[in-house]
Amino acid sequence: MALNIRKTHPLLKIVNQTLIDLPAPSNISVWWNFGSLLGLCLIIQIVTGLFLAMHYTADISLAFSSVVHICRDVNYGWLIRNIHANGASLFFVCIYFHIARGLYYGSYLYKETWNIGVILLFLLMATAFVGYVLPWGQMSFWGATVITNLLSAFPYVGDVLVQWIWGGFSVDNATLTRFFAFHFLLPFLITALMIIHVLFLHETGSNNPMGLNSDMDKISFHPYFSYKDALGFLTLLILLGVLALFLPNLLGEAENFIPANPLVTPPHIKPEWYFLFAYAILRSIPNKLGGVLALLFSILILMLVPFLHTSKQRSSTFRPLTQIFFWTLVTNMLILTWIGGQPVEQPFILIGQIASISYFSLFLIALPLAGWWENKILNLN
């Protein structure tokens, strides 16, 4: 019998073990689609970003005009820009669903995979932030000024750190140039880390909705999950098409259609919608350094989750109390997102502070206590 080339060729063998003959649990649901959707989002963003970079000029006197030029004069430039801008939003939708799936089904117990995932989230947020500055509109400029200025809260080194990032004494040409360099570079770093993320996942195999060992019931990735992923791809592409073609500015900020003016501050400085929850946590603390640390810990807390797991069961499927707290956390995130887009006045300040305390309390107190109590009532200890 002739040897199968996909199982013997050094390169094809890797592809085969990752995408074709990979043993996958037979009961993984649609929530396991988001990993591959994130891969698709990354490819879309790199391809559209590359074409945008061919026509973009990273100079404060030309950046805004070059984006206008892309939309008006470049063949399908408007479409490429709309796909890139809305693709970023869908990227965050997918990553938040992906993280929520991991929290609900206990996937965080694969510690290496989970921690690399958290680093990937940080890198994605950094990429989106520096990318938002590039069109050099009002919100680009003032968003960059406000967020980078937060680093000045760190004692002793703060002011030097801010000037080092700015490349001067204010957000200026040097800042835009380096942000463009970072925005071009970081997606490739994300790609490398994504490969390591998948590598670590395949050391253990996928988790499943029941949180049980599925070694006795595995099926091959192709054709079962390759077709299932293809359906997910189609859904995502339709959604992206609808957004880019019919509602391209739905998730954007109208203020960013005004060229950056250092002399005029916008009435409400706020980031893109996918950062609003973290921005609300930042604003809920009156102290500058405290706010910055809360902002950092709002993401870093995900790294603590594996160590706060007290339940004898992995998944939340059969744990009603944990489910209640999980959905409370989801609702809390939505409230924080809403508050992040509101002006700093009552009652929004108080709601934001309550939601911020709830956010950390759910992770650090409620969920570990729920796991411990469920062990007690089920006599699992």
From Swiss-Prot:
Cofactor comment text: Binds 2 heme b groups non-covalently.
Q: Where does a ubiquinone bind?
A: H202
Top-rank taxon of the source lineage equals Eukaryota
Is Electron transport there in the keyword field? yes
Cofactor(s) of this protein: heme b
Q: Which UniProt keywords apply?
A: Electron transport, Heme, Iron, Membrane, Metal-binding, Mitochondrion, Mitochondrion inner membrane, Respiratory chain, Transmembrane, Transmembrane helix, Transport, Ubiquinone
Instruction: Kindly list the residue ranges recorded as spanning the membrane.
Output: 34-54, 78-99, 114-134, 179-199, 227-247, 289-309, 321-341, 348-368
Protein name in the entry: Cytochrome b
